[in-house]
Regions:
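A conserved acidic beta->alpha catalytic loop
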Residues: 40-49, 91
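Cell-envelope/extracellular polymer assembly enzymes that use nucleotide-activated donors
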Residues: 4-7, 35, 182
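Glycine-rich, basic loop-to-helix element that forms the pyrophosphate-binding segment
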Residues: 66-82
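Short beta-strand/loop segment that forms part of the nucleotide-sugar
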Residues: 33-42, 64-67
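Conserved nucleotide-sugar donor-binding catalytic segment
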Residues: 141-219, 223
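Short aromatic/hydrophobic "clamp" motif used to bind/position activated sugar donors
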Residues: 87
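Short, acidic, metal-binding catalytic loop of nucleotide-sugar glycosyltransferases
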Residues: 24-33
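Conserved donor NDP-sugar-binding/catalytic core segment of glycosyltransferases
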Residues: 99-132
Length: 294
């Protein structure tokens, strides 16, 4: 079996237009000590055929296509398939800076006691793609690190996890629809060794087809209250939706102002927007390389 330092894991379903853009770039930039793991949820839009060809050509290392019970089920399968020492979740419609991800992975490889690395985050929406905002959970991390709170939340779009740490922090809870929110609370409540990177390894892209744009608000609220009690979560600004700042940004981008159909549509040809996203995240990290806060 090959030895991999870093596994990029993807769970997807019927998102070929986004997935093809993301995978094309990842495949182009992949290093020899890295693998790509893809779990498809039995897509019907051509995704299966596309991934099957990539797998036959040896461009992705592991691939299955079968129905998932829910979103977290698909991601759990992908994480369990990973063979790398470090696991990085790649969401099919978001943007990632792979050189910065490797910087985070190298830090974890050099510091075996670290379970998880999280970072600052960039946010944008397809309907106004040149407007990019920054978000951070650093103040919440500091509160937790200094034991002023038992748990805090963060999005999983920028998270790196040590594979061997899964036996301690667990996988996604398949009951929770706000799976990254619960996962973050659990990791911090368990006092996992979390390190904060002050750069940006990911850019979250909001659009009308994004999974997080269509959550059941009532169920999210009910499960949020449940998780709050489970993990003694004091709450902060993320409580607005009991999700993460990423979802708050999406909601504002999609439904603010006139709330018309024109505000939520985007071109099916997303190449221009994503080219801009990749350019900007690289520029931002070159201007501010970031550092690690232990």
């Amino acid at each position: 079996m090959n030895n991999y330092n870093l596994s990029y894991v993807i769970s997807t379903k019927n998102r070929l237009s986004f997935l093809s853009v993301t995978l094309e770039r990842l495949i182009e930039l992949l290093n020899p000590d890295e693998e790509i793991v893809v779990v498809d949820g039995d897509s019907t839009d051509g995704t299966k055929e596309y991934l099957t060809l990539l797998f036959k050509e040896g461009k992705i290392h592991q691939y299955i296509s079968e129905p998932d019970k829910n979103q977290s089920h698909g991601w759990n399968k992908a994480m369990l398939m990973a063979r790398g020492l470090i696991i990085k979740k790649i969401i099919d419609d978001d943007v990632f800076d792979y050189s910065t991800i490797r910087k985070c992975a190298d830090f974890m490889l050099a510091n075996p006691a670290v379970d998880v690395v999280i970072s600052n985050e960039l946010n944008a929406s397809l309907n106004n793609y040149k407007q990019i905002s920054k978000s951070s959970r650093f103040s919440q991390f500091e509160e937790w690190k200094h034991k002023r709170t038992e748990s805090f939340t963060f999005s999983d779009v920028h998270i790196l996890i040590r594979r061997s740490s899964i036996s301690f922090i667990g996988l996604y809870n398949t009951v929770f629809v706000m799976m990254d929110w619960e996962y973050a609370l659990r990791m911090s409540f368990l006092n996992a060794r979390i390190v904060y990177f002050t750069g940006y390894n990911a850019l979250s892209v909001g659009h009308i087809e994004s999974v997080s744009a269509n959550k059941n608000a009532k169920l999210v609220h009910q499960q949020g209250e449940r998780a709050r009690l489970m993990y003694n979560y004091k709450g902060d600004a993320a409580d607005i939706t009991l999700w993460s700042k990423f979802k708050i940004k999406i909601g504002k981008a999609l439904y603010a102002k006139n709330n018309t159909r024109a505000d939520t549509t985007f071109k099916k040809d997303i190449t221009e927007a994503y080219s801009y996203f990749y350019l900007k995240i690289s520029e931002i990290n070159n201007q501010n390389p970031g550092g690690f806060i232990v």
